[in-house]
Amino acid sequence: MARIKGGLNAKKKHNKVLKLAKGYRGARSKQYRVAKQSVMRALTSAFAGRKERKRQFRQLWIARINAAARMNGLSYSKFMYGLKLAEVSVNRKMLAELAVNDAEGFKALVEVAKSKLA
């Protein structure tokens, strides 16, 4: 049986990596060995970035809720505790949306929280 060389597979693999490295500067987009390292690092950073994005958005929502709650005379922690006592289950993303886009609706929630705290 004839020996089968892996040239075609190697070429496909190299082209796949070089395609991912398109736009990188210098040897990073031209040479397979350097491009492979850069692509691996980029993919690792992209994976970490997708996890980081979730944390950053939660931080942003909390900051917005805190600012709006303080404008209505309540701290973030007391506001959230008041909502918990009132058995209002609205997630932080929606609370932040209310704080930014519907000040009156948010104020009503603050009043509900205040009444349960008192």
Curated annotation (Swiss-Prot):
Keywords: Ribonucleoprotein, Ribosomal protein, RNA-binding, rRNA-binding. SUPFAM superfamilies: Ribosomal protein L20 (SSF74731). One of its GO terms (molecular function) is structural constituent of ribosome. One of its GO terms (biological process) is ribosomal large subunit assembly. InterPro entries: Ribosomal_bL20 (IPR005813), RIBOSOMAL_L20_CS (IPR049946), Ribosomal_protein_bL20_C (IPR035566). The keyword Phosphoprotein does not apply. One of its GO terms (cellular component) is ribonucleoprotein complex. It holds the Pfam family Ribosomal_L20. The keyword Ribonucleoprotein applies. Belongs to the bacterial ribosomal protein bL20 family. NCBIfam families: rplT_bact. HAMAP family: Ribosomal_bL20. Binds directly to 23S ribosomal RNA and is necessary for the in vitro assembly process of the 50S ribosomal subunit. It is not involved in the protein synthesizing functions of that subunit. This is Large ribosomal subunit protein bL20. It comes from Lachnoclostridium phytofermentans (strain ATCC 700394 / DSM 18823 / ISDg).
